[in-house]
Structures are given as structure tokens and as C-alpha cells.
Amino acid sequence: MNLYRRYGWELTLAALLVLEILLFGLSNSRMLDINVLLFSTSDFICIGIVALPLTMVIVSGGIDISFGSTIGLCAIFLGIVFQAGVPMSVAIPLTVLVGALCGLINAGLILYTGVNPLVITLGTLYLFGGSALLLSGLSGATGYEGIGGFPAAFTDFANQTLFGLPIPLVIFMLCVLLFWLLMHRTHSGRHVFLIGQSSRVARYSALPIARTLCMLYAMTGVASAIAAILLVSYFGSARSDLGASFLMPAITAVVLGGANIYGGSGSILGTALAVLLVGYLQQGLQMIGTPNQISSALSGALLILVVVGRSISLHRHLIYEWLQRRRSRKASA
């Protein structure tokens, strides 16, 4: 009982995930093939790598919608640095530093101006996206081709396995463990929850708000850089549009995973399960031949249904009291 009370939403998501796979398996038996399930994660798991630190940002009461542009900027930066003759062993750490710098720019602007994080990161979304396009143009990269010619050892990395699992999935699982420990087993994680519940109380309690926010946005930038590196390795080319479609799926996964969009509550494990739920929904719909427009609409409908259902569950006592009052008024009338 205590387990369900503590992880009730996560268990619900896990049950929905199993049910989803079984239902799609009735239409296409390939959906029940364990190898298909494992290796199809490479198509969407990078969204999850970014969604994990984004969960902590949202729990703190903030938001970052610039990570898609950060991915594109880091990807094209990696390609340009490689083109310049820098070894991959140096280019990859430099790319991670660029991602961290993007996150710190977001945090610095939010702390310095006091403007809503949504507005700040909307601005940096265009700043980083425009910078990626500018670098892409200067490097001579064209359209969908991007910058290629990477070493085989690098392009094979994201397509290899470790203990029978795809490398991107292994990295995602390690990130889940890392962020779960950080959020639920450290003082920094408790600070994130307290800041999200009331930034004013957190300020009066002398919590390190500035340091915590810098850490959160920097981690989102680093995760974006890691996602960019994996995507470049997976596709074999560096393009400025690699993260363009990540925004809505990542935010959907965070909200679906149980995070309060206004801050104060959230779950790393819930986000991880929601990433798989949304990812396999898209994969399953593609396998049964559903057009992309319909699959996107169904994903949005799923989010709305789950959010409404969760809201009803959280406020069921208030709803019950309201119904009781209505019955009492009708009886007295």
C-alpha cells in the first residue's frame, strides 16, 4: 500500500506502457519482438536524455524551451570543429562545454533580469537556432546533408550494443539513475523541490537559489550536447535541425510523467516511463500505417486525457465534497 501511495502514478504509467505494447502487438506482431522494442528506442531515446534534467528545471518552477536549438547548435559545432581538423577526442568535450555554456546563458539571463524563464528561453531558442543556421551556412553545409565524413568509430558508436542493449538506451538508463539519485537523494534535489514550491520562502531560508538554477540549466545544456553527439553519430551527419522536433515530445513526457508545470513536484522515474510511453506510441502508430498528422494528434489527445485524469485524481476529495453538497441541497429542496 505504501509503495502504491508513493509510486502510484509511476505504476500506472508502467501498466499503460505494457497495455500499449500489447494492443499494438495485436495489430502488428513485430511490436511484441523484444529486439524491435529495444532497437526502436534509438529513434526517440535522445528526447528522454534531455527530458530528465528538464524535469528538474520544471520542478524548480522554471522552464527551458531552447534545448532543441541547443542540440542543433552543438551538432553543427561538432561538425565544424571536426572539419577544422580537431580530433574527435577533443571535439566531443568542447561540444559538451558549448552545451553547458548555453545552459548557463539561460540561467544568467533569468537570474539577472528576473524575467519569466519562458520568455528568456524563447529568446535563446531563436538565438541558438539562428547561430546554428549561421554556422551551418558559413561551413557550407547544405540542407539535409549537413556535415559528414566522421570517423567510422564515431558513426558506429550510437549503433553498437552493450550487454545486448543499444548504446543510446544504456546512456539513457545511466542518466535516469544519475538524475534520480540527484533529485531524490541529495540536498541539491531537496533544494529544487523547495524552490519550486515557494521561491520566496526558499530565498528567506537562505537556500542557494542562484547556484541551484545555474546547475539545473547547465545540466539541461549538457544533456542537449550529449543528445546532439548521439544524434550525429546515429545519423552520420551534423545538421542544425537535429533537435527541431524535440520540444513538444520532451515537455509532453515531463508533464505526463507527473511534473507540475508550475513547479514543486515531479518524478524522474515518471518522466522516464512517459518517454517510453510516448515513444512507443509513435512507433506503434507508424507500424500500423497511421499518418504522422494523426499520430501527433493522438499524442496530444493522450496528454490531455492523462493530465485531466491526474487532475481529477489529485482533487477527488474536493470533487466528492462538491457532489455531497449538491445532493444535500437537492434533498433539502
Curated annotation (Swiss-Prot):
The chain crosses the membrane at residues 7-27, 45-65, 67-87, 90-110, 118-138, 162-182, 212-232, 240-260, 261-281, 288-308. Keywords: Cell inner membrane, Cell membrane, Membrane, Transmembrane, Transmembrane helix, Transport. The complex is composed of two ATP-binding proteins (LsrA), two transmembrane proteins (LsrC and LsrD) and a solute-binding protein (LsrB). The keyword Transport applies. This is Autoinducer 2 import system permease protein LsrD. GO terms for molecular function: transmembrane transporter activity. It holds the Pfam family BPD_transp_2. Disulfide bonds: none annotated. It is found in: Cell inner membrane. InterPro entries: ABC_transp_permease (IPR001851). Belongs to the binding-protein-dependent transport system permease family. AraH/RbsC subfamily. GO terms for cellular component: plasma membrane. It is a multi-pass membrane protein. Its main location: membrane. Part of the ABC transporter complex LsrABCD involved in autoinducer 2 (AI-2) import. Probably responsible for the translocation of the substrate across the membrane.
